[in-house]
From Swiss-Prot:
Keywords: Cell cycle, Cell membrane, Developmental protein, Golgi apparatus, Hydrolase, Lipid metabolism, Lipoprotein, Magnesium, Membrane, Metal-binding, Palmitate, Phosphoprotein, Sphingolipid metabolism. Palmitoylated, palmitoylation-deficient proteins are targeted for lysosomal degradation. It comes from Mus musculus. One of its GO terms (biological process) is cellular response to magnesium ion. The lineage of its organism: Eukaryota, Metazoa, Chordata, Craniata, Vertebrata. Belongs to the neutral sphingomyelinase family. This is Sphingomyelin phosphodiesterase 3.
Amino acid sequence: MVLYTTPFPNSCLSALHAVSWALIFPCYWLVDRLLASFIPTTYEKRQRADDPCCLQLFCTVLFTPVYLALLVAALPFAFLGFIFWSPLQSARRPYSYSRLEDKNPAGGAALLSEWKGTGAGKSFCFATANVCLLPDSLARLNNVFNTQARAKEIGQRIRNGAARPQIKIYIDSPTNTSISAASFSSLVSPQGGDGSRAVPGSIKRTASVEYKGDGGRHPSDEAANGPASGEQADGSLEDSCIVRIGGEEGGRPQEADDPAAGSQARNGAGGTPKGQTPNHNQRDGDSGSLGSPSASRESLVKARAGQDSGGSGEPGANSKLLYKTSVVKKAAARRRRHPDEAFDHEVSAFFPANLDFLCLQEVFDKRAAAKLKEQLHGYFEYILYDVGVYGCHGCCNFKCLNSGLFFASRYPVMDVAYHCYPNGCSFDALASKGALFLKVQVGSTPQDQRIVGYIACTHLHAPPEDSAVRCEQLDLLQDWLADFRKSTSSTSTANPEELVVFDVICGDLNFDNCSSDDKLEQQHSLFTRYKDPCRLGPGEEKPWAIGTLLDTNGLYDEDVCTPDNLQKVLESEEGRREYLAFPTSKSPGAGQKGRKDLLKGNGRRIDYMLHAEEGLCPDWKAEVEEFSFITQLSGLTDHLPVAMRLMVSAGEEEA
């Protein structure tokens, strides 16, 4: 399938569209600024309360007549531009595809050659987030503002979080339940390798810090500054760090004589100091940014290499990193596993390291989408943005906004399809909300069979009273997904050209699994075909699952204004009741605070990550390895991003 890199099929239409939008934009911008000046956020209200001279109010009164005068002057030009813009939308393509050619060893082409579908399994990490990048006046209805600056900061934080070192902690205690047994293979053999998954006979208590290249580096950094310090000439950045936290004999750490340790890159073994991660270069968003990998003391283990046998009499001091046990235990405590759970789950201050696929919702503003794309291209090679339709093309109602869907991938995209929900009503009818379907290639077998996966990203109808509309959209979602798989799958079942190893649905579904008003959606057949890792059954959540919709009134409180603070708050039941949104109460006169005191549960979880256990290739299985609720976008959106790591392996393999 040919992917569309431009919104129009030829340059003539593109030029005509650019001219028509240039005529419309001044009017659009003035209306947005005029409305935004009358919708203050709680942050701005607090600033005004601290302003004894009422300077901000004076500016609003002063500039409102100016905006109105300019708006009247811009209206004729906007009307002329609209005459050309509207019919052009019938020829507009439903998305724009962008690929950044990446020569890094972690680029998409190199990733395909890593995994042949034999030997060890491979994990893939998915994340979804509603980022509320609406025009500024509409974003303020959700108590967020400055859409353009937020778009850039969101991109920086996601990039820095995904490109940070991947930390895994392994403890040999047979009673420990805070670590992932399924993750152990990634310590023994690198992901994507075909090496044996055999467990060494003696496992020491270790913490593994794995990082796979400076994927978070901005594309322009290397051109301007040259290769990052510490990078090898060939760009290979495969390194790891073993941290001893237990198993001492006589008060001294044991030597790293394991077979597993022998497969790790040893710190200080070469001329390059391995204790410094290459993606800690000074770059956009690192200095003072909450998205910096160094922003959280508790989410990362800080490594520092020792001097070359300078002040240490202990042999091998510069090839081992010693840490206090309490520091590593603090990091390990972030992962908690329920006794009956087969995977790790946590509230994390960072997006998962080595994030493979990112699905975003509410990226409605075109300029914000461009800024977001520019930032994320520092890590993701393949991006689809500006997804949706405008005008009356393909839908009953006139569409002023696109779908808001945005997709980024480290792996090549093979096929794409988009469908607009035809039953939108109320204010949701102004946006072309729909579903984006993607087929990605993640490897190839020795027999030249492609290893592929399917991903669907969607955003359902928002008004809470329209349950029937959402159920109809879920029906359409399943039908469209079945048609997409049928139209893009290999024709021969006896000798297939492709192996399907995962099928994932993610997005903002705008209903939860705890509200009595959402019973219709909770019992939908989608949840029989796709598994929700956070759900026990209709209306029943797993005890560790928390809501993903924040109470907008508290977005700028000091307790939750940073990723670390929000993480700590959400780990306590009292904090969740204070800062998460809960189902609306039907009892009249019940205050927000008093209502929450009477509620049970952990808030409204409306952002979902679902995966299929059936419909994959025979003898293959996809199992959840980790599930995360992420606080890294605190203060930038009213939703919590969620992430899921799937371990894909042949069914006959032993874990």
